[in-house]
């Protein structure tokens, strides 16, 4: 069963998100020397800044130097490009941390960027090579269309949801620019110890209704709930959850 937290105030959401992440960190570090986590782009990055950097009650508990950070998806653009998830995470989080408390971060290899399918497949294959078999925590967003990572709904994009061999794949037709991306596929999410979605705002109302009331598993986010619900948590605000009727998840 999926775990869902619904919050009336952003500060409460980000604080509880931070508590959740730090708990997962501590659980991992009790058993081994590092915490393997992946992040996505978009509004999730701002939530992570507020949870783990700006929240003083939590920031001192984050053992950044023991974090190994990967990216659940990335746009195939230079890392300094405004569309880069790594670049956004660097500006919002990494640049705010002291030089003595930096995590190990694994961005896409931008030196491989070309202009053809061979280059893009090579970028995905190279990233798959460095992503651990088991991540301790995968932090995810949810688009208004129900996409997560760069796994989009619709038959055009079904090849990514059906992928069982490649753990990182080239998404060559994103409906949102830039069209070329690399993305985790479902096998990575299957092997991860915990999955966590963050969704906020009125633009998410209709898709939250489809995910939680209609349980439309044609949507990648709803499919994740269906397949991996026992280890999946959602942090949402009341605005996003305004049309959801169900009380059982």
Curated annotation (Swiss-Prot):
The pathway it acts in is: Carbohydrate degradation; pentose phosphate pathway; D-ribulose 5-phosphate from D-glucose 6-phosphate (oxidative stage): step 2/3
The answer to keyword Hydrolase applying to this record is yes
- InterPro entries documented for this protein: 6-phosphogluconolactonase_DevB, Glc/Gal-6P_isomerase, NagB/RpiA_transferase-like, PGLS
Q: Name one GO biological process term.
A: carbohydrate metabolic process
What Pfam families does the database record attribute to this sequence? Glucosamine_iso (PF01182)
A GO-annotated cellular component: nucleus
Q: What does this protein do?
A: Hydrolysis of 6-phosphogluconolactone to 6-phosphogluconate.
Tell me what else is known: Present with 3420 molecules/cell in log phase SD medium.
Family to which this protein belongs = Belongs to the glucosamine/galactosamine-6-phosphate isomerase family. 6-phosphogluconolactonase subfamily.
Matching entries from NCBIfam families are given as: pgl
Would you tell me the protein name for this molecule?
Answer: 6-phosphogluconolactonase 3
